[in-house]
Structures are given as structure tokens and as C-alpha cells.
Amino acid sequence: MRSPGIVLLLLLLLLLPPGAAPCPADLCPAPPRVNVSLDAAPAARWLPVLRLFDPGLLRAAVARIVGDRVPKWRDVIGKLVAEMESFLPQPYTKEIRGISDFLNLSLADGFIVNLAYEASAFCTSVVAQDSRGHIYHGRNLDYPFGDLLRKMTVDVQFLKNGQIAFTGTTFIGYVGLWTGQSPYKFTVSGDERDKGWWWENMIAALFQGHSPVSWLIRTTLSESEDFEASVYKLAKTPLIADVYYIVGGTAPGEGVVVTRNRGGPADIWPLDPLNGAWFRVETNYDHWKPVPKSDDRRTPAIKALNATGQANLSLEALFQVLSVVPVCNKITVYTTVMSAATPDKYMTRIRNLS
């Protein structure tokens, strides 16, 4: 008799185009896992991690991303950042200052590259509940420049008083988080909501005190005490850009997709397992609208989840769902699966289909 794992793998294989197969997690490399002490001064807390990486690689990544993603009038942004540094959100601006000084970059370029990441994160996120009421959360992060970013991806354990306060996955030099977990409380991921990117509006909102979307994830992981509090903070805090926040908790039913406008929530889409809605899939499109045929990652993910079945759901099964092409694609940088109820099982793997 075949084991449930073998049956699941065979079912997923049927969903794939020729030549595309799930990648077992143990065959995909894990990123470095590093510690960042929040008890250290903001300007110094990333320095031990930075010393583990080639500074030339990091400077090259900044130059490439800024050159490709940032408007030609970035000099104007640089002047604004220099003049308004003391008014920008903390501790993040001080952290960027410390990183920039270490890499011999201007604060403006360090700041701009952090904002550039906010604009281009294409993603797939899934929050789901198994038949026993356990909550699982997974995400793929897709981004151009994968040749650089795969070398810069890290799992970060943020420490307070020597203990893990929360965990997140990010790129070296980027102080925000698109993926994270507060142990025994909640998990969260962010997916870009593309409403047309206007740097002018983003900068204006920033100087009005609105939060970058990835900084709010990190703040929420640091400050919110439970699933409900995290959803409220993620739904209500003014932002510099639209986004989808996907949140998973520890109790049955604790899973939601929050569709955000800059000023507040556009939609709240919770799990509804009693009525058969045991998972939610969010890519980069409003869930109540059809996805464009040119970028349909939603349908393959839904098919893979239904093929898996609620009774067979696990972190490994969710990893396989996120391995189905085109959910996993040539610009997928990493996959993370997590469950706040079992925080030690937080797992990230680097993907490289190119």
C-alpha cells in the first residue's frame, strides 16, 4: 500500500506540465540563519550579519536595483532623505544608516533600495487549516535579480534579551520583512498589490508618517500579542502603498487575507472551514476578480491544494503545492512554510528554476 506522501506526490505530478516536477525540500538549499539583537543600537545591530557577506556583492546589488527600479530623479529623493532623516520612521532609518555606512553607500541610496523592494515583490501566499484544526502558512517570493538575491537571502532570528522574539526572511541590506513568524502567536506574509506605482505618491505618503508595507510587518511581529491584534494593526495602519497581508494564527479558523488600500482595509477574507473554505490563496490580484491569463498562479495553487486534501495537509505538503509550476517560476527566489503553533519548524528554501 502506498504511503500518503507518495500518493500526494503522484497527485501533484499530474498537475504539472511536462518536465516540471516538485522539488523536495531537502533537495533545495537553505539560506543562512542569522541572529540580529534588538538590544543593540539600531545602527550597529546588522553589522555582525553584514560581515558574513561579500560587501562587493551587496554594493553591486544596490547599484543594479537602484539603477533599474528607481526614477531618474532619485537625486531629489536623496536630498529629501538627507534633510528629513530625523523625521523618518525609526528604528528602521537608523538601521539603514548603519548598513549604508558599513557598505560605504550614501544614506539616500540605502534608503532608496529599501523602498525599491517595496515596489516589485510578486508573490504567492497560502494560509490553510488541516482537518484537525492546525493552521499552516506558506509563501513564494518572486523578484527580478534572482541571481543576486538568492545569494543575499537570510532567515533572521530577531532577539530580545537573548531570546527569539520573532523570525523573518529577508535580503541582506533590507530592513523590512515580507515573511515572518511570532512564535506561538501568528505568521504573516505580504504580497504586492499593484495599483500602478507612483514614486511621487509613495514618497509623499512616507513623509506624512505612513509606513512602508514591509516595515509594518516587522513592527507587527515585534509588538502584536496575538492573531487578532496583528490583523487589526495590519488592517488599520496607514501605508505608503497598497498590499495584501496574509495572516495565520494558532487556533482553528485563524487565517485571513487582508486586502489593503493605503488608508485602510479594502477587504477582509477569512478562512471559513465550517463551510468548506479551508484555505485561501493570494497572488497579486484581488481575490474577487479574475486573474489575468498571462499570470495565473492562483488556479494551479488551488488545484494543487484540492489534490492534496485537507486531511493530508502539512508543511511538507504545502511546500509541494508551492513547488508547482507556475506557482514556482523562474523569478521565485525563495519558499517559506511555517506554523506559529510549531515555530521551530519554520523553513525557507532557495528556489532556482532558471
UniProtKB/Swiss-Prot annotation:
This is N-acylethanolamine-hydrolyzing acid amidase. It is an enzyme of class 3 (hydrolase). Its EC number is 3.5.1.60, 3.5.1.23. It catalyses: N-hexadecanoylethanolamine + H2O = ethanolamine + hexadecanoate; an N-(long-chain fatty acyl)ethanolamine + H2O = a long-chain fatty acid + ethanolamine; N-dodecanoylethanolamine + H2O = dodecanoate + ethanolamine; N-tetradecanoylethanolamine + H2O = tetradecanoate + ethanolamine. The lineage of its organism: Eukaryota, Metazoa, Chordata, Craniata, Vertebrata. Belongs to the acid ceramidase family. The record marks R139, N284 as: Important for enzyme activity. Glycans are attached at N35, N104, N306, N312, N352. The active site is at C123 (nucleophile). GO terms for cellular component: lysosome; membrane. One of its GO terms (biological process) is lipid catabolic process. N-glycosylated. Tunicamycin treatment causes a reduction in specific activity against N-palmitoylethanolamine. Keywords: Autocatalytic cleavage, Fatty acid metabolism, Glycoprotein, Hydrolase, Lipid degradation, Lipid metabolism, Lysosome, Membrane, Signal, Zymogen. It is found in: Lysosome; Membrane.
